[in-house]
Amino acid sequence: MKLVTPTADLHASWLAANAEWGGEHQDGAATHLARGLDLTDPVDFATWVEMLNDDSVAATNHWMVEDGEYLGAIQLRHTIDSPALADLFGHIGYGVRPSARGRGLARQALREVLTDAREIGLHRVLVCCREDNAASISVIRACGGVLENIRHVDEFSLSHGVSTPTCRFWIETAS
């Protein structure tokens, strides 16, 4: 598996992965940037990919790809300067398509992105996941994550689409 810059060339594979998620939100894929776009349309998809690669956005997006197949996404947010990022989402978000899970892809991607975080001057990063996501908790801990707390559901979290308790882990990026 390699982390690559998002590309419109993977449209068909991305659509297949999206279907595995039921056409819903994909963690780490920054689909929120596509509001108003039809990602099944190649032109709209290419527009969204350009947004992902826009240097003016304070985030770095990578796609997990193997043999030309889209397997998932991981996003490194350079700052967590909003209450939602600081409390619920953190510096790094990721997701692996259901058919590719259990192969260590998330762990590999997170380790690589931790190096990127260190290179841009982040000495530690916040990584959050749902309390009921045992696989993600295992990935985060395997990469050095230390649980700070579990944020319980309230009006603020619900207003940001988070309806389950959120585990908040810090990971030191220094080697």
Predicted regions and their residues:
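Conserved GNAT acetyl-CoA-binding A-motif
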Residues: A117-C128
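Conserved G/P- and acidic residue-centered "switch" motifs that form tight phosphate/ATP-binding loops
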Residues: G68, G104, G121, N133
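Conserved acetyl-CoA-binding loop-helix of GNAT-fold acetyltransferases
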Residues: G93-V96, G102-E119, I137-A142
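Short secondary-structure boundary/hinge segments and terminal tails
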Residues: R118, A135, S157-S159
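GNAT-family acyltransferases
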Residues: M1-H91, G95-P98, D116, V153, ...
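Conserved beta-strand-loop-alpha-helix junction that forms the acyl-donor binding cleft
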Residues: V127-I137
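Proline- and acidic/polar-enriched loop/turn elements at helix boundaries
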Residues: E112, C129, H152-V153
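Conserved acetyl-CoA-binding loop of GNAT-fold acetyltransferases
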Residues: R141-R151
